[in-house]
C-alpha cells in the first residue's frame, strides 16, 4: 500500500498550556474545523471529545494525553491536504510526566496562553520541557474575548519570563467584548469570521484605520525576523526591496524550525475565532518529520546509529504511552521514526530483548478508534497485543536493531500507605496497582518490609488521589489511604566496652546457658552492621559464635528508642563462658540479643531521619519566599543559580522528609503555582532532640 499523505505534509504536534488557558476547547475546535467532529464538545458541560476519562470530565482538567489524527486543507482550502497528529497534553503540574513523554515524540508544539493570565506556571514548565527536546513552537493567545485580555502583555511575558523571541504574525482587532477578529500581518488584511457558520466561513477585509500604524509597526518587526533567516533574504531586506508573502513565510518557517523565534497568533476558541488561522500556521511554520534531524540511538553492541524519516529505512519506533482501554485491553501508543510496519508483523524490543507480534494497529481519534493495516515513518498509532513493552521502549526491525534514547522520568516525591477496605479487594488491589504502575512510570508500588503495608508513591498529592480514584472506578477496588509516613532509623553515637549478656535457665533437667561479652562501636554513615569474632582460648565454642551474630541481627530490626531499625553499628564478641551440658545455640542467640540491647542503651542511641535533596525551579521574584519556607522546614539551603536560558533560579537545599509532606501544595500557593520542584533521598542524618522526642513519644503512645 503506498503512502496516502507525503511525509512532508505530516505535522506531529502537541497542544500545551497552563491548566485553564482553554487548551481542550482549542483542540475541540481543531477537530471541528478539520471536519472530524460535527458537534462541538464543551468542557463546561463535561462533553469534550479529547477529555475521555470519567475523572477528567468531572474535574474539567485533562489528565491523559489522547492522540488524535485530523486533516486540513487550509482555512481557505488553498493547501494540499495535510495530516495533523495532535497530542493533547495535561496542564496540571502533577501530570508533568504526561507532557514530558509527549514532548519526546513531537516535532512541534502549539503553546496556548490565556490572554488575561498570560504566561502561567505550567507554561514555564512546559517551555522548559520543549527546550529540553528542542521542540519548535508557535504561540496562540486564547480567550481574547475575556475582560482584561491583553495580547501584547503576553508577548512581553514570553520574552521576559521564558526568554523566547515571540514574533506576532497577527494582532487582535479589538479585545474583551469588542474582540472581532485578527489582522493577518503577512497579508496585511483583517480576518473576520462568520458567527452563523461557527467560524467555518470568513472574509478578508481592510484593516481598520485606527489599527494601521500598530499593524505596520508589528509587520516591520515580523519581516525583520523573517529576513534574518538567511543571507539572501537579509540582503534583499537591507536593500529596501519588499519581501514577497512566500519569502516572509519561508524565512519565518526556517527560523521557527531552528528554534530561534516563536510565531504568535491570537483568538478565542470559545467564540470560534482564530483557531482556523492557527491551523494554517501549524502547516506554514511547524516542521514535518522530514524537517527534523534523524533520530539517534545505538546498536546492541553500543555503536552509534541513526534513522532518517523515510519509509525505505528499517522500521524503528518509540513506545511513549501505555493505556488500558475498556474494550481492547492494553494499548501501547508509539511514534514511528522510520520504515513501515504492518499489523501481524514481528517487531523486536531491544530494551527487553524480546520479539513480539504486533496485533491490531489502531489510530485514535480521542477515544474513538479506527483499525488500520500499516503505519509508516511519521505516524503515531496505538498497538494491541504487545505484552512486554513499557513506556520509553524501542520497537524495531528484528534484523536491523537500534535502541533509541530512553525517556527520563522523575523519581516520585510523595508516598502513602494504601490498604483495601475488604479482604475481597486485596487481590484486585494488587492487580490494579500493577496495571496503573505499568501505565505511569512516575507511579511506584512497593511493600514496606517493616509494616507489611503496600506503599504507593507518585508526583504529588493530586496524582495519588487520582490513581486511588481510578482504582475504584476502573477496577472496582475500594481502598483507604494512610497519612504519608517517614522511615526513621536508629544508631549509636559512642562506643561501649564489656557489655554482658547472660541467658541462664537451670532448674533441674536440661537447662540453658549462654554468656557473652560484647564491645559496640558506631560505624560511618551507610556502614551497615558488622560482626567481629575476637574470642581467644575457646571461651565461647566455635559452633555457638554464629548464633551470637544471629541474635544481634534479630535485635537490629527494632532499636531501643522507638523500635526503628538499627544501622551503622559494629559488634565485637570479646569474651564469654559456656556450660558443657546446658549451652546450646538458642542460649547464645538470646545472650547476644540481650547484650546488644543493653549495650545500645549505654551507647547514647540517637534517631536518624531521611534527608532529601530538594531542587526548586522558581521565577526570580519568589526566590526569597522559597528559601524562607525551606528554612522554616529545617532545610539547609546550600546553593542557588540561574536557570540556563534565563527564566528564574534553581534553589538547592537539603530538607528532612518529615517536613516535606504537602510541599507541592504549599509551593504552589507560595509561588502562584509558578515553581516546580524535584526531591530525592540523599542520606540519613541525626534528628534534632525535639524532633526525636516527638517521634519517640508518638511511637510509645
From Swiss-Prot:
PANTHER family: RIBOSOME-RELEASING FACTOR 2, MITOCHONDRIAL (PTHR43261:SF1), TRANSLATION ELONGATION FACTOR G-RELATED (PTHR43261). GTP binds at residues 17-24, 88-92, 142-145. Belongs to the TRAFAC class translation factor GTPase superfamily. Classic translation factor GTPase family. EF-G/EF-2 subfamily. InterPro entries: EFG_II, EFG_III, EFG_III/V, EFG_IV, EFG_V, EFG_V-like, EFTu-like_2, G_TR_CS. The keyword Protein biosynthesis applies. This is Elongation factor G 2. It comes from Cupriavidus pinatubonensis (strain JMP 134 / LMG 1197). The keyword GTP-binding applies. GO terms for biological process: ribosome disassembly. CDD domains: EF-G, EFG_III, EFG_mtEFG1_IV, EFG_mtEFG_C, EFG_mtEFG_II. Pfam families: EFG_C (PF00679), EFG_III (PF14492), EFG_IV (PF03764), GTP_EFTU (PF00009), GTP_EFTU_D2 (PF03144). It comes from the Bacteria.
